[in-house]
Amino acid sequence: MTDRLLVLVRHGQSEWNLKNLFTGWKDPGLTEKGVAEAIEAGKKLKAQGLVFDVAFTSVLTRAQTTLDLMLNELGQTGLPTSKNLALNERDYGDLSGLNKDDARKKWGEEQVHVWRRSYDVPPPGGESLKDTLARALPYYVQEILPCVLRGERTLVAAHGNSLRALIMVLEKLTPESILKRELGTGAPVIYRLNADSTVASKLDLAE
């Protein structure tokens, strides 16, 4: 029987997560806590008896480091890995690098909330969640999903918003539903798919 395994993991806490800054395509590393979260994610996957054939990640350090730390725990450091900006975090444009409280002072609480939580309103010079989906979804359909359907056990380490794009398709969620979905740092979600790419089972290791 083909094991159509897909595991999604948001990167561990980054230095800018800790400082409450908009990060987007900026490239801070992981905090000590973030490193520990990534190692713990690897241990959780190992405890599930999982072995992988292929991995995907973004071009940003925090996701790549998370993947490396997980693979080290799994004893799979040489795993074939594709790195692509399609899996990058949403680009926050002019908000990137700003403290979220400072942004609220500059543009107002309501406007910043709209930029952060609306589906299709981008911040100045940046991407909306809809824009992020527009680059992440084709990559999932063309590159990641075929691996899973071939029975290649697949691990994806990426970002809150690029993973929301994948989850939206996997779980057939509406834009309103996916906006409410919070993804914990370093928390693996294990999917097994049917041959028609629908979800056969889901296990959230954050729970």
UniProtKB/Swiss-Prot annotation:
For this UniProt record, the keywords arranged alphabetically read as follows: Gluconeogenesis, Glycolysis, Isomerase
Annotated site location: Transition state stabilizer: 159
Member of which family?
Belongs to the phosphoglycerate mutase family. BPG-dependent PGAM subfamily.
Which Pfam families does the annotation name? His_Phos_1
**Chain's gene name:** gpmA
Q: What is this protein called?
A: 2,3-bisphosphoglycerate-dependent phosphoglycerate mutase
**Pathway in which the depicted protein is active:** Carbohydrate degradation; glycolysis; pyruvate from D-glyceraldehyde 3-phosphate: step 3/5
Q: Does the keyword Cell division belong to this entry?
A: no
Residues bound to substrate:
10-17, 23-24, 62, 89-92, 100, 116-117, 160-161
Query: How does it associate, per the subunit comment?
Result: Homodimer.
The Gene Ontology biological process terms listed for this entry are: gluconeogenesis; glycolytic process
Q: Which transformation does this protein catalyse, written as a reaction?
A: (2R)-2-phosphoglycerate = (2R)-3-phosphoglycerate
Query: Which residues are catalytic?
Result: 11, 89
Look at the named UniProt entry and state the broad enzyme category this protein falls under.
isomerase
Q: Which domain of life does this protein belong to?
A: Bacteria
Q: Which Gene Ontology molecular function entries are recorded, alphabetically? A: phosphoglycerate mutase activity
| The keyword Iron-sulfur is annotated on this UniProt entry | no
